[in-house]
Amino acid sequence: VTNVTIAISPDWTIDLNIPGITVLEWDFKTPPPADHIDIAVAPHVTTPDLVERVAETGAKLLQLGSIGYDGIPRDLPEGLAVANAASVHETATAELAMASLLYAARDLDRAREAQVEARWEGYYSAGLADSTIILVGIGGVGSAIAQRLAPFETNVIRVARRGREDMYGTVYSFTDLPELLPTADAVVVAVPLTESTENMVDDRFLSAMKDNAILVNVARGKVAVTDALVAHADRLRLALDVTDPEPLPNDHPLFEKATLITPHIGGNTQAMYRRMNRLVRKQVGNFISGEPFVNVVLGR
């Protein structure tokens, strides 16, 4: 392939100064900027109708801007592949998970409140050292979190859909959670949204956690049952980057009850743009050379 047309959402700034490449901007809401497009780079947030719009252009690849692809229909038009943004967001999301965990474990909300009121007030907090942390989900994001937890001298219990042994030790299964949760000082949720994980963090899950334990959610909002979070927010410390719904209504009780709410910004760092740039250039290069696309999660 010598001539490639790529349509890119204005959410991204991609450097594609490559001979034979035509780069067009497309908001994916208006008609496509060309009759034929080879590769479409989606905005941060995708909707099911976006796939149909892209398919009408004869595109070979829809490159998502997210790791998750739960909003994409599984019955794709023939010839269209969907790739996620694995390698783009894992590090940044793990950073936010660690920041949220430390914020809650060191009671930094308390320190901030004292600062605003100009009070010098010392206190002790739980901290992370010697604590037990359950990590639910050990995919790209979960593994990145596990790597960052290692220097903090914690006991990390890893949990995934399927229990197994790997090079790092035991991975417990979701079915082990009822026995594991009461032991945890903190639980970090980093699973994809699937049929088996939707509403996983429900009343039963939260009831099994001990008082003052920390729950960090950097997965998807629908992994947790919102009413259950509200019900347990007075005895648990909730640090949520994702919620259901998003955005939360401004009068939602979680704003007051949660220890920390961040507006789904797990991947939002400058590194995201550099890494997305590298990924798109890789996809274009593979298309030109006839190599398979990388990160394909749906389609051919």
Residue ranges of predicted features:
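Phosphate/diphosphate ligand-binding glycine-rich loop within oxidoreductases
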Residues: 38-112
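N-terminal glycine-/charge-rich "phosphate-binding" loop or analogous flexible N-terminal tail
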Residues: 1-42
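Rossmann-like adenosine-cofactor binding region
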Residues: 162-253
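Short, conserved loop/helix-junction motifs that constitute active-site signature segments
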Residues: 50-58, 74-78, 205-211, 231-234, ...
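Rossmann-like dinucleotide-binding domain for NAD(H)/NADP(H)
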Residues: 212-214, 218-300
